[in-house]
Amino acid sequence: VAAGDRPEGLVSILRTERLDFGYPRFPVGRGVDLEIRPGEVLCLLGPNGCGKTTLFKTILGLIPRQGGRILLDAEDLARLDRRTIARRMAYVPQAHAAVFPYSVRDMVLMGRTVHRGLFSSPGQDDRARAEAALAQMGIATLAERDYTRISGGQRQLALIARALAQDAGLVVMDEPTASLDFGNQVLVLKEVRRLAAAGLGVVLSTHNPDHAFACASRVHLLADGATRAAGVPREVLTPEVLTRTYGVPVAVEQLANGQPVCVPEDLSG
C-alpha cells in the first residue's frame, strides 16, 4: 500500500506482536513488540550482535518468524506473497558496489520491477517514477553515471531513490550510514527525515544513539535479543540505559539547539 493509498483509519503500517526471531536451533530474539506508523521514523538501536539484522530479515519475510505475529497493513505477513510484500515494503541495504556497471538510473529503475515483472521492459510510468525519485534525492545529475564510480554517500542516496521508485509505504533501512564519512551520514539522516515528512514510514537500524536523537520519532533499544527500552529517544535513552547497554560510562549532553548528544564520560583508559 503506497503512502497515498492507505485505507482510511489504518494506523500502523507494520506491527509485531510478541515476535520471536532467529532460527529453529538458534533463537536470537524474543517477545519484541514494534509499531511503525505513517510519517514516523523508528530507530532500531543496539550494540553489535544484539539481533538487529536477524530481526530485519524476519520483518522483511526473508526468514520465518519463530513465534508471535508480524502484521503488514493489518495483514499477517506469513499470508502475503513476495510480490505483495515488496510492493508495500521497500528495503535499503548498506551501500555496496554492484557487480555489473549499471547506471544510477538503471539502479533506480530496478525498484519498479515488482510492478511489472523481472523480464519486462520499463514503461513510461516506470521511467517517470524513477526520474522523480532521482530528483527527490537530489541526484538527477548522476543518472548516467556508473553506479560503481560514485561516492558511498551518493550510492546510498541512489538506493533510497530505488526504494522511493518502488512506491511502498514503508522503507526499511539496514544501517544506512555504515561506512559513510560524517558529511554523508548527515546527508542520509536528513533524507530519512524528509521521507517521514512526506508520509512514509521508515525503520532504520544503527549502532549510534546520536542517530536516534537526530532523526527518530521513536526508538527501540535491543540488547541480547530482548527489548531494553522503547519510546521517545529523549525519554528512554538516558545515561543509565546507555551505560548499561554499551558497557561504558555514557553522558547525554545538549547542543546549543537543544538536541541531545552522547559523549563518553572517560577516555583516559
List the predicted regions and their residue ranges.
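Conserved ABC transporter NBD signature motif
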Residues: 68-76, 85
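Catalytic Walker B motif of ABC-type/P-loop ATPase nucleotide-binding domains
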Residues: 171-175
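The feature captures the beta-strand-to-loop junction immediately N-terminal to the Walker
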Residues: 45-47
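Conserved structural motif at the start of ABC-family nucleotide-binding domains
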Residues: 14, 28-31
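ABC ATPase nucleotide-binding domains
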Residues: 245-269
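Helix-to-loop junction immediately C-terminal to a conserved catalytic motif
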Residues: 60
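Conserved ABC ATPase signature
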Residues: 146-150, 154
